[in-house]
């Protein structure tokens, strides 16, 4: 049985707010999505920002066959102690874990730890959904997009984006808002598959997150008004009826297959 580590990107306070609101944490969503494909993985969870024993966990990273690093509401350029702890932990993971799937915030942490750059999006944001992600010629030949449609919509929630990739990185997909939606790079002993969007999170949770973060989103001017939120949520609800669960999660499925090779 393969052993993997899931890294929780949100602070424990944010996760407690999720729990109080009856919303699954990102780690819980990821575990549920993994279980759709397999129950034959031994899974540990770490939160570098909050775990007091994180230095002890660093010593044991060699025991993992793979790592999945999930989403967060943090902004990496804010350079807080909690964010620095995550970057330090990612650097250690990139030395010791061969197969890494970095999702949304996870991709931003992986890229930054490897010398790339993340900034606030210039062309807008994704608020529960990303439209028209296109797989390029490199992505079409990459295992992460095996059997994935060449243009697709997907759950997503991000206001920041990768603008400079690590040395030797290959961009795999993009859309009109983010030039880098998918990438692949190798560093030290790690092969990092990165995606800016969330195949592991259902649209229904994205809608709940929009309502949960309503005041924050209005303050950030992500939406002009409550009426715009209603209209936007309706468009996501329409997408639910058009989407296919297995196709939506194809990247996760393909990474699990990659994990189980050798």
Please state what every model-predicted region is.
Residues 19-22, 81-84, 114-118, 169-170, ...:
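Short, glycine/charged-enriched secondary-structure capping and boundary segments
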Residues 1-88, 92-96, 220, 224-262:
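N-terminal beta1-alpha1 cap of cysteine-dependent amidohydrolase-like domains
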Residues 170-262:
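C-terminal and late-domain segments of enzyme folds
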Residues 9-11, 116-188, 192-204:
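Pocket-forming structural segment of enzyme catalytic cores
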Residues 16-17, 55, 78-79, 111-113, ...:
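Short glycine-/acidic-enriched loop or helix-start segments at secondary-structure transitions
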Residues 72-138:
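Cysteine-nucleophile active-site neighborhood
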Residues 64, 68-69, 100, 104, ...:
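Short glycine/serine/threonine-biased micro-segments
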């Amino acid at each position: 049985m393969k052993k993997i580590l899931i890294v929780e990107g949100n602070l424990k306070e944010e996760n407690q707010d999720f729990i109080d609101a009856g919303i699954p944490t990102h780690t819980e969503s990821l575990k549920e999505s993994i279980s759709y494909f397999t129950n034959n993985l031994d899974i540990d969870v770490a939160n570098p920002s909050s775990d007091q024993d994180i230095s002890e966990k660093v010593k044991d990273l060699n025991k993992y066959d793979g790592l999945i690093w999930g989403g967060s509401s943090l902004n990496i350029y804010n350079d807080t102690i909690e964010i620095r702890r995550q970057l330090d932990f990612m650097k250690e993971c990139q030395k010791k874990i061969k197969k890494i799937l970095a999702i949304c915030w996870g991709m931003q942490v992986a890229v930054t730890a490897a010398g790339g750059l993340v900034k606030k999006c210039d062309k807008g944001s994704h608020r529960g959904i990303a439209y028209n992600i296109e797989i390029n010629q490199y992505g079409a030949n990459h295992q992460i997009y095996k059997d994935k449609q060449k243009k697709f919509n997907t759950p997503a929630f991000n206001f920041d984006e990768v603008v400079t990739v690590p040395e030797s990185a290959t961009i795999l997909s993009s859309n009109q808002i983010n030039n880098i939606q998918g990438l692949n790079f190798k560093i030290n002993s790690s092969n990092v598959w990165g995606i800016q969007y969330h195949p592991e999170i259902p649209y229904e949770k994205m809608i709940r997150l929009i309502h949960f973060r309503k005041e924050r989103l209005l303050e950030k001017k992500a939406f002009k008004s409550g009426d715009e939120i209603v209209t936007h949520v309706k468009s996501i609800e329409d997408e639910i009826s058009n989407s296919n669960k297995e196709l939506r999660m194809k990247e996760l499925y393909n990474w699990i297959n990659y994990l189980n090779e050798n």
